[in-house]
């Protein structure tokens, strides 16, 4: 009995000789799923295909009912392919088209600006380099300038730097006495 219990598989699988070399087999990996697939033809497919060559109609063929949709009606009514002034309506009766009256368009004359070169466009954007316009269009009544009103005490204009200095802690602006001394010098 000891001889029967040896590592013998229950079913012996006969080895099939393959046409591939042993190098190809080792390159495919452990499960051999990347190998070349052989063209297999299933014998089951041919009889099945021959059975279904004829189509069987179980129900009676229904006569085709033509349903007109709203879109089709609109498309047909808008078509202007016919040269006649009559057109079939949705009822099947002929009706005359209304003639479209075109309103006369009023043409507005647009003044074309003078074609300007690159330098003229740049000069126009810069201050002080404006081209003098027509003198006749600008001739207007002289503007009356009211005399400037003098204030009791003149307001000092502060620069940006002075405004920033005032906001700094510990900054004490000059008194009026110190400013008068500088003005005298």
Swiss-Prot record:
Keywords: Acetylation, Chaperone, Phosphoprotein, Repeat, Stress response
Region annotation Disordered: where it falls in the sequence: 1-138, 166-185
Region called 2 X 21 AA repeats, Lys-rich, residue ranges: 112-174
InterPro entries linked to this entry: Dehydrin, Dehydrin_CS
GO cellular component: chloroplast; cytosol; extrinsic component of membrane; mitochondrion; plasma membrane
Tissue expression pattern: In stems, cauline leaves, roots and flowers. Low levels found in maturing seeds. Absent in dry seeds.
Single GO term (MF): lipid binding
Pfam families: Dehydrin
Biased composition (Basic and acidic residues): 1-13, 25-45, 52-78, 103-134
PROSITE patterns from the UniProt entry: DEHYDRIN_1, DEHYDRIN_2
GO BP terms: protein stabilization; regulation of membrane permeability; response to abscisic acid; response to cold; response to desiccation
Modification sites for Phosphoserine: 59
In-chain residues carrying the UniProt-annotated modification N-acetylalanine: 2
Induction data: By dehydration, cold stress and abscisic acid (ABA). Induction by dehydration occurs after 1 hour and increases to a maximum after 10 hours. Cold stress induction peaks at 1 hour and 5 hours after start of cold exposure.
Positions of Sequence repeats: 112-132, 154-174
Function: Intrinsically disordered protein acting as a chaperone. Prevents heat-induced aggregation and/or inactivation of various substrates. Binds to acidic phospholipid vesicles without affecting membrane fluidity.
Family stated for the protein in its record: Belongs to the plant dehydrin family.
PANTHER family documented for this protein: DEHYDRIN ERD14, DEHYDRIN XERO 2-RELATED
Protein known as: Dehydrin ERD14
Source lineage: Eukaryota, Viridiplantae, Streptophyta, Embryophyta, Tracheophyta
């Amino acid at each position: 009995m000891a001889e029967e219990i040896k590592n013998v598989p229950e079913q012996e699988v006969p080895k099939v000789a393959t046409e591939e070399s042993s190098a190809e087999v080792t390159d495919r990996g452990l499960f051999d799923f990347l190998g070349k697939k052989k063209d297999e033809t299933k014998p089951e497919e041919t009889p099945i295909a021959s059975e279904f060559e004829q189509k069987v109609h179980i129900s009676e063929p229904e006569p085709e009912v033509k349903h007109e949709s709203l879109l089709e009606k609109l498309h047909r009514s808008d078509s202007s392919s016919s040269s006649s002034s009559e057109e079939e309506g949705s009822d099947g009766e002929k009706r005359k088209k209304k003639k479209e009256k075109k309103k006369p368009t009023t043409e507005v004359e647009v003044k074309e600006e003078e074609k300007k070169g690159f330098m003229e466009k740049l000069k126009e954007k810069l201050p002080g380099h404006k081209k003098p316009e027509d003198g006749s269009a600008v001739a207007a009544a002289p503007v009356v300038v009211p005399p400037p009103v003098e204030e009791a005490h003149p307001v000092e204009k502060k620069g940006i730097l002075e405004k920033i200095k005032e906001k700094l802690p510990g900054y004490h602006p000059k008194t009026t006495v110190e400013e008068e001394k500088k003005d005298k010098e």
